[in-house]
Amino acid sequence: MENIDTWADKDLSILIVGFDGYKDVWDIDIYLLNKYWSNRPKTYLATSVLKPEYKNVEVIAIGEGSEWSKKAYNALKVINTKYVLLLLEDFFISSPVNNTLVLDSLHLINEYKIKFYQVLVQLIKSSWEKGTPFQGNKHIKIIPKDKKYPLNLQAAIWDREFLMETIGKGNYNAWQFEIKQISISDINVNKIEYLIDDRNILNIEHTIVQSKYLRAPLKRILKREPSIDIAGRDVLNFKEDFKYQFKLLMYSLTPQCLVKPFKKIGRWLSIDFVTDRVTNNKVC
């Protein structure tokens, strides 16, 4: 592991965009961040109104009524590094981060002027796997044009200015941001600028869906950190967890031409799809 005294000259910051109703999640997330990645870039937490104090984290309260986009955009105006590692508060770092892997990735991003470098893959199998290895590295793929959600809110290192342009000055939620990216068709056409790394270099566990803890990730984290207080939030029951895993499996393995038929099956099983809620303006 590379030992560095400071990240000040590495041109990278970390931005966690938080939802004020997840204060209990912030406490766990930042505890794990400080434990498993203590030597890291300057870290910011963007909130609406709450401004708790955390070690090694600068909290930026954007204002009441701020949705994901407004919090992210205004926090990015405060940050002055060229690149930003964008995270959500339910991305828990579950074991020590190897700074050598992070720095190697940052060097690659700098050298090839990459705008979007995704570092977390949750799908079992997806169109990204068809991407050509970048510079011969089988773990780093060129994002193909037909990838679902080519730009998304999985953990990723973004060019800060490009991220601000992509978000814009509106005030909307995270799901609406991702839905907007479905129609993007010029990914890596004239120049390679969008990559995906399947190594999970930050050792992230995505822990919460539908405001509840996922069973398997929570079990793994509690095995390592039994003292964590999860009393402020429910855990998905077996049926809810099954529905989520079924949906994830469907998106991972289903060809685009079969998504609509499989969604019909999912709705018959009372499975909720974010695209339906966004289309019906039910997400707030």
Regions found by a protein language model. Give the residues of each.
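Membrane-proximal basic amphipathic "stem/tether" segments
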Residues: 1-10, 223-284
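A broadly used, surface-exposed interaction patch
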Residues: 64-76, 83, 96-97, 101-105
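Catalytic core and acceptor-binding pocket of nucleotide-sugar-dependent glycosyltransferases
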Residues: 150-216
